[in-house]
Amino acid sequence: MITRTRVIENLDELLSHGNREGRRIALDVLEAGLAAPDPYDNVRSVVRLEGRRLVVGNPALSQPPGREPVEFDLDNVGNIYVVGGGKAAQREAEAIEHVLGDRITEGQINAKKGDSIRLKRIGVTLAGHPIPDEESVSGARRILEILRKARRGDIVFLCISGGATSLTALPVPGVSLADLQEVYRVLYFGAGANMPAANAVRNHLALMNTKFARYVGDATLVSILTTETPPKLKVHLFERPDSADPYNAAIDVLRNYNCWDAMPTSVREFLLARDPQYGPLRKEETQGKPHYHFRVMGPEYMLEAGLRRARELGLNAT
């Protein structure tokens, strides 16, 4: 049984004056909405133990269409690793830690500097955001080390949320951290690039951004994801501009934002070289492999929960 912590901490103060009944209803709806996207609670409802079986999935949450829960017999599972990064990744990993405890072999999460460290069995590195830093790189190297240990029969939980791109930035060969930082500064603060456009560039320049699956071999990969856009929206944060050549897409973004010439020489040379081993994941790299993806947080969670609670309270809500 999961007990939720109240989100609105000053509830009593807010109910101490004015139209108390009206406030109570409004705050009740707001509390339901604010609590719904909590990554810890949602992961606890998705990842659970049923005897000696590890069950992952919860059809009650918004998941990819057709995604049914998957089950693993723990007696037949080897090592269990937990890795990832993002501003909500610690909460995701904390839920897994509380479910699996000492069944977790090891792990590494990169979280944002300023956060408190919440994990006990899983390593945590506090790294830079929105500009990656040395800690982003050192923590990402640790993640890569763990991913490369995984073998058939092992399970790798990948916890990803907003901010993971900078927090787990490990530059590709030939591009320094300083050069990668300059790319972020130019795109974000100079050109004002939107997220899909920025991702089209920066995901090429780091070893793992959107490419974690490349390094897990034949191990089972269970991705626990949050997204900032509702699933029905056409544009998703991880999508890239249409292009038959993804490297061309990155180059086109830089030219369209008039910042190609502002890019460090190493970045321009890397993109023009079009090395496929560092490009986006190819379908054949993961086809037929035991990879599962579960979405545990999105903005529609808040809206849908608030709507349900309003109707439960007898309001004519739409």
Give the location of each predicted region.
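An N-terminal, well-structured beta->alpha segment
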Residues: 1-83, 91-92
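Glycine-rich oxoanion-binding loops at beta->alpha junctions
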Residues: 57, 62-66, 110-152, 196, ...
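Active-site cofactor/substrate anionic-group-binding motifs, chiefly glycine-
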Residues: 71-76, 81-115
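Short beta-strand segments
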Residues: 83-85, 108-111, 157-162, 199, ...
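A glycine- and small-aliphatic-rich helix-loop capping segment at beta-alpha/alpha-beta transitions
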Residues: 95-104, 121-123, 148, 171-182, ...
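Short, acidic/small-residue loops that bind anionic groups at enzyme active sites
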Residues: 105-108, 173-201
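A glycine/threonine-rich phosphate-anchoring loop and its flanking beta-alpha core
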Residues: 193-260, 267-271
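Accessory alpha-helical/coil subdomains and C-terminal extensions
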Residues: 222-223, 242-317
